[in-house]
Every structure is written in C-alpha cells, then in structure tokens.
Amino acid sequence: MAYYGKCIETVIEQLDKFTPKRDNPEQFLEAAATSLQALSPQKQSFVLEVLSGCLEYRKLLTVVVDAFYVEDGRLCLRVDHSRFEVICYLATFLLEELGFQLFCNIIKSQPVDKMCKFLRFFFNPLHLCSWIKDEWSLIYEPAHVKENWIDPLMRWQPEVQELINHLEGVSASQSSPLKTKAKVTEPKEFNLTAPRPRTIPAPEPVPVVAKPRPVPQSTYQPPKEQQQLETVKRYNRRKAEELLLRANIEELRCAMPRSCRERVQGSKQQLRLQFPPRIRKTPKLTFYRPDNILVKLNTTAILREGALYQRQVEQELQRVDKLVDGAGDFSEFFEWQKKMQAKDREEQLAASECRRLQGKLSHEEAVLARQSLMQENKQRVEQQKEQMAKLMLQRAERRLREDRSRKELVEQVIEGQKNAKAAQTKLAKGRQQTVQEAIEESRGLLQRRAQAAQEEQRRRCELISQLRALETQPTRKGKLVDLTQIPGYGLEGEMSIVELRERLALLKENQRRKEEEKRDQIIQGKHTKSQELQNMVEQISLCRAAMGRSAALRWEEKKALAAAPAAPSQDERVQQLRRRISERAAERSRQAALLHVSAPRTARPKPRAQLEAQHWLELERSRERRLQALQQGGSGPGPARRLEAA
C-alpha cells in the first residue's frame, strides 16, 4: 500500500504544479518526465500514464469533482482537488486494467474518510445515469460515453459499494474511544466570614533626581541685540530731524534769480564760499559707530553708483550755474506745472474710475451670460434625453444580434471539438519530431565548439612556450652614457646634456624673477584700487544721505495729497459707463423675472447674489469718497512741491 500511496502522491504533486492558462500539456509532460528520472522505470511509467490521462480528460474529471465540492464535499479542503481527480480517473478509465484488488489497495493507501465520501458520491447510480452522463455527453459523443464509461461504472458499482461499507466499518472501529465515567463535581460552601488578609505593598524606591542647573542670568535681562536696535533707532530719528530742520531753513536758496547785468567770475568758487555746504557730517555720538556699513557692495556696484552720483552732481552744478548767470523767474513755470499735475491727477482718477466701472459692467454681462447659458443648458438636456432614448433602442437591437451570433459561435465550437483529438495527436507527433531535430542540431554545435576550444587551447600553449623561451635569453641591463659629450648628429644648436640642464636652470631663474615683479605690480594696483573704492564709498554714503532727505520730503507731500478729499469726476467716459451699467442691470432684472416665471422652482432668494450686489455698492461708495478726497487735495500746493520742481 505504501508503494501505491507514494505513486499517487507523486501524481498529485505534479498535477498541483499544472496551470491550464499558462502551461502546455505536452511541454508539461516532458518537464515532468525529466524531473522523474530518479524513479524506477515501472514506477515512472505508471506515474506518467496516470498524469497524461488526467491532463487529457481534465474537463470530464473537473465536472465530477466540482459537483462533489458543491453537494457532499462542502467541508473538504480545496487542496485535495487533484487527489479526487486522480481517483476519478482510475475508477473511470483504469479500473478494468488494474483490477479491483489493486484498486482497493490504492484506495486504502489514501485518507479513508475522504475516499468514502467521494466514492459514495461518484458511484451513486442516480448521479451516474442522470447529470454525469448528460455533462459528459456535452463534451463527447453520447453513445461513446454510455458504452465505454457509464456502463462499466454501473457494473463495478456493487463491488465498490461493498468496499465503501468495509472502509466505513474500519473508520468507525478506529474512531470509537473507550467511554469513561465523568467525575462528579463536588460543590464547596462559600466562606464569607473569614476575609482574605490584605497584602502589604512593597515600598516604592525613591527616585534619584539629578541636580537641576541654575537659571542663567540672561533669562531676566533683555537681549543685547534689542538694545542695539533701540540705540540705532534713536540715533537715526535724531539725525533725520536735524536734516529736516536744516532743509526747511535753507529752502529755495539756490532758486533765487540774479540780475543779468552783473558779471559772474568764478561762479563755482563763489558759490562754494558764499553758501554753506548742504550736506554736513554730524558729530560723532558716544553710543553709535557711524563707520559700520550695513550693506557690503562689490566693486562693480560701487563704481556704477559712484558714476551715477557724479553725473547727478555735475547736472546740479550746471543748473546752478545757469541760475547764477541770470536765468528767468520760475513763477510761470510753477503755475504751469501745478496745472499739468492737477490735469494728470484728474486723468488718473478718471482712468481708475473707468476701470472700476468696466469691472462692474463685466460683472453684469457675466450675469446675463450665465442666465442665457442656463436656458441653453435646459434645451441641451432635453436633446440629450431624446438621444439617450434612441441609444437605448439601438443597444437593445445590438444585444439581440450579439445573442444570435453567440449561439452560432457555440454551435461552431461544438463541431470543432469533435476533431480536436486527431489534431492533438498530429500536433504531438510534429512536436516530438521537432524536438528530436533540435537535439541533434545542438549535439553537432557542441561538438564543433569543443573542437574549436581544443584548437584555441593548443595555440595558446604554443604562444606561452615561445614567450618563456624569449624570457630565458640574456639581455643587457645597463648602458654607458657620457653626459658631457655632444652626440654629433649634425643638428643645429646641438649640445650636451649637462649644458642643456644649465640653460634650463637659467631660464627657470629668469621666469621666477619676472613672476615676482608681476606679483608686486598686481599688489600695488590692488592697493591703489582699494583706496579709490574706499573714497568712492564715502562719497556714495554722502549722496545717499542727501537722497534720503529728498525722499522724506516727497513722502510728506504725497501723504498730504492723499489725506485731502476729492470732488466727483465728470468725465464723459465715466458717465457713459454708468449709463451702460444701469442698462445692463435693468436687462438682467427683466431676464431674471422671465426665468422666475418660466421656472418657479428657482424663485427662491439667492443670498450669494444679494451679497455680491451689496459688495459692489460698498465698493462704489468707497471709490467715490476717495476720488473726492484726492481732487480736493490737488488744489493746495505746498513749498515742498516747488522745491521738487526746482
């Protein structure tokens, strides 16, 4: 029994490895034959015969085993699927060839409970004559099924039933253990008066706490960086106040006209002597270091900024020279400048108002477009519903045509399966012949490769022997050379090696001397350039201070202009945009009323639209207030504006 059990286990193991979707049966059998070469010839032939039969009649066996799992084998594992297929194949195709006694030995070598369930299900006369016969007749001819498979199974059914009864008796005798008398439970009374003594808890160990670090004194003191920032802020504010006071005192001194009849001699020198310098260094304070440059500039930035400030200084000096030489009064120019600035400011306000009104107009047009889009969407939805109904009808017709074509295809497949066995036999013979030819061709290739490898090995041995013979020959290792002797090849400028070395040493010395001189020149040039850059940085700092004062004056002037109220604009473009906005709003209200009438479900209030309308109204009011403030502030010019114009 152990012998047959090992054979059946080998077949089951090989069947578990087979995957119908991925593996080819012929190739799988060849691979299995190569893996089973370690077995004896008799055992190998039996395993391969059963394995090939299970693969060939896999459809028939799968029908029976799947039905067994559905009805009687619900509690059986899916791992035993291949085991049931092998038993079904042996009972159907090899029972007469093996003999009933050998079949009984094979059945007894397997698990008894599983075999009893499966054989009772498979050899049930009701199952064999009804659905098993019908299912097998769908795959093969009904006459062939009844004559070769169903009738032999029905003849063997009584003997198999005796085998099943015998196996059930054996399993019942093995599984019935000796029944022992159960021990009676003896109840015990509860002892409620004697409480359990309380356990004394173990003392907890006192944790050892590390000594904490003292709080640093810097925690209770303000940081040094904050103190330094406060110091710098106070110094900068004091310096700005001094510069503003000095600018207000010396205001418009350079713009005073002189008589044209007075002759000017040395205008630049007289100006420098007559007027004090506009920019003076403030005295050093004890709490601030003015040499601390906050921004580090590279050479290119310093030169560029220095050239810019130099051009500005030259232009300012030229303008002062023209004024000193007798230029006219600037009152007319100031009046014209004020008018042009007021006109430019009004144009800017009108342009900003136009932009705001255009935004509001685009909003109204967007609302109109959204309403028209809603109407178009309703029409499009109705069209899509009609198209969907047509598509559903077409789909139903297409399904009917597909069902008819599928039935025709099933009939064609059934007819093609009748000739499948002959085609498979022919295909197997062709594949065996192809494999034999490939094996012979590979043998020839291996022989040719072995001959080529032997020839290559022989050639390498000859080369190695020749190299070893060359290595054994004596060679002259040294050569006598006179370094002071001229070779005498007849070349121009020919010299000995000693002379060549001396000349090379002299050339290196000259080159080193030239490099040192060039290095000294570079260092001197860098020093000069750094000094010039330092002077230019000081000049740039002075010019920046002057520019800062002028920027502060312009900022004060802009603040004064922004704080003044402005009058409402009367521009034609603004009026036209307002009229268009009112027309669009009226049109939008008319369309909304039409939509409310046509679709009563959408007549509920829209809080989002109300919020948008309120937002636009508040934005328009704030814009009008700002325009009034700006226009009222443009009428009153100050001394700072005249200074900027000069």
Curated annotation (Swiss-Prot):
Intracellular or extracellular location(s): Cell projection, Cilium, Flagellum
InterPro entries: CFAP99
Predominant place of localization: other
GO cellular component, one term: motile cilium
Feature: compositional bias, Polar residues: 217-227
Coiled-coil residues: 368-459, 494-522
Keyword terms, alphabetized: Cell projection, Cilium, Coiled coil, Flagellum
Region of interest (Disordered), ranges: 195-227, 627-646
Family, similarity comment: Belongs to the CFAP99 family.
Protein name as it appears in the record: Cilia- and flagella-associated protein 99
Organism: Homo sapiens
Lineage: Eukaryota, Metazoa, Chordata, Craniata, Vertebrata
Name of encoding gene: CFAP99
